[in-house]
Regions:
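Short, charged, surface-exposed secondary-structure boundary motifs
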Residues: 57, 82, 103-110
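Short, solvent-exposed amphipathic alpha-helical segments in soluble enzyme
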Residues: 63, 88-90, 173
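Acidic/polar loop patches that form or flank catalytic/metal-binding clefts of enzymes
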Residues: 70-73, 95-96, 165-166
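Short hydrophobic/aromatic-enriched beta-strand-loop microsegments
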Residues: 90-98
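Short, acidic/turn-prone active-site loops that include or flank metal/cofactor-
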Residues: 48, 98-102
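Short secondary-structure boundary segments
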Residues: 76, 98-99, 126
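Basic, amphipathic alpha-helical segments enriched in Lys/Arg and hydrophobic/aromatic residues
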Residues: 112-173
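Polybasic low-complexity intrinsically disordered regions
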Residues: 1-86
């Protein structure tokens, strides 16, 4: 698969009122999809791919059979009919965000359900924020294997950080 991806930038209108020119910027990047322990925040499994890969294809790679919880929490990028059917066959309960219907406002019930799901799903975002802010993780490698090694080491360091946090917390009572 091609690791290059395009990032689209919407141009602002020009001063004379004419529309600006939209641009597409090619960029080289990687994605890290993780599953975490909801109780303690440890990273259970990680899959690194190039940035051009669709998120919905990653769900099967990060959902593990050794996880005793039946709920699967994810954002809308992971929702597809194939993933929903797969989760049902795996006896899992989908807690994946719902997308807004095209051309209509999101129903209030769906919006409230997404807000409730976000409270749990935000734990995953803490993993990425911790890696970016505390560890200064920025991938500047060429080759998926090097990027995977760097991200795996960052995940290991994050898990050690979480372990120390829980050990100190338990020691304090």
């Amino acid at each position: 698969m091609n690791p290059w991806t395009l990032k689209f930038a919407k141009a602002k209108p020009l001063a004379n009122g004419k529309p600006g020119i939209d641009i597409a910027i090619p960029s080289f990047g990687y994605k890290s999809s993780v599953s975490i322990c909801r109780t303690f925040g440890f990273i259970r499994k990680c899959k690194v791919t190039d940035a051009a890969r669709f998120d919905e294809r990653m769900l099967r790679d990060v959902v593990t059979n050794d996880n005793t919880a039946s709920d699967v929490w994810a954002d809308t990028a992971y929702r597809s009919q194939a993933n929903e059917a797969w989760l049902k066959r795996q006896s899992r309960v989908s807690r994946i965000h719902r997308k807004k219907p095209r051309g209509t406002p999101m129903p209030e019930r769906t919006a409230k359900a997404n807000v409730a799901k976000s409270k749990v799903r935000a734990r995953v975002e803490h993993v990425f924020a911790g890696q970016k802010d505390q560890m200064g993780l920025f991938i500047r490698t060429i080759g998926i294997k090097r990027a995977e090694a760097k991200i795996t080491l960052a995940n290991l360091a994050y898990n050690m950080h979480r372990l120390i946090f829980h050990e100190r917390r338990a020691a304090m009572g």
